[in-house]
Amino acid sequence: GVQKSDLFFRVGTIGFEQAALGKIAETSPGLKIVNCAAGITLSEGTHGGPRGYDPHIWVSVRNARQMARNMYDALVEEDPKDKNYFTERYNALDSELAQLDSTLTAILASCRGAAFVIKHPSLTYFARDYGLKQVALEVQGKEASPAQMRERLDAAGKAAPVVFFIEKGHDSAAVVNLAKSMNLPTVEISLLDYEWKDNLLAVARAVARQCADRAGRSE
């Protein structure tokens, strides 16, 4: 359990994680808590709270590289005798992530400025990385009022989105129907699945495919 651990890696600004940190520190006074979000420029205003930091930092390859670096540094500091092992594994991971970032950049090269709709603003950092525009239907990560929803839908219409992302296991039938009413193609994604790399590639390919289709129709 946590009591027997030397390090605790926190993702960053996830609500339930922050709520638990006080108790964890109290019951495990010798535990070192490592903030994996250190060095990442957090996006503000998409979620509730004083500054509304977006907690979904892992939905970004560039953020993931920084998170891996933070973990590597903490491990080397805690266990310097195994630095060579940690360095070898870290370098392999960083190389893989750099290649994935290059692949995503290439897939989305012709889509800069393209917009997509999603209920919960979970793709903020992904959109930032590749010059996309996320139109979230929630307000600061919470259900929108009828008036707010009208504003969101107006914003979506003006942004001319190419796809509506449905989050598997989270979005209701009403959200699916809303996407249909907007005459947008829908793509189901699951950003918490183990196959993280495949999910990010699926998001990129969906945007690229719809950008290409729209460009073809306009010719």
Regions found by a protein language model. Give the residues of each.
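Extracytoplasmic metal-acquisition and chelation regions
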Residues: 1-219
